[in-house]
Amino acid sequence: MRAKEAGILKDVELRLISELMKNSRRSDRELARALKVSQPTVTRTRCKLEKEGYLKEYTVIPDFAKLGFQLASFILIKGTKSRSAEVMEKARQITLKDMAERAPNEIVLFNRGMGGGYTGVIVSFHKSYSDYTELVGRMKQYPFVDTSATLSFLVDLNDRIQYRPFTFSTLAKHILTPQKQEKK
């Protein structure tokens, strides 16, 4: 269900998010022109969306290969069998502490999930294969990760054949597409 249909976002709010996902570098005046609303409306709406947490950050998608990164890795992990609330909270605290102290900056996503028997995913970028193996080695320090049961998918960022380059523009268009009515 689209956010607008759920009554969470107004049409102009959803369209503004879509425009920002396509290009967050545009001025409020340019966004107002694209949305066919006034510049103060865009400014007020953008500030509201920031305050309410709909807009977390403004960023760019660089050419990672030109920045010296060779690999993108998607690592599926399994948690250890003991998954009590206490163990999961301890795991979360260890992860947050490690992220704050050692700042493994190559990790762009580390989250719980499900599918194929796996319970989490790590998405990261690496300048070399040895950088990637160093991250995998650090994972052994996490007592809640079953390191004997991980699955890695590596993407060569220098590969000339790309079926769809990394972009949010397609998702920006998708959030404006009406969803099919569910059968009752």
Where are these regions (language model features)?
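A compositional/biophysical signature of low hydrophobicity enriched in polar/charged and small residues
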Residues: 1-184
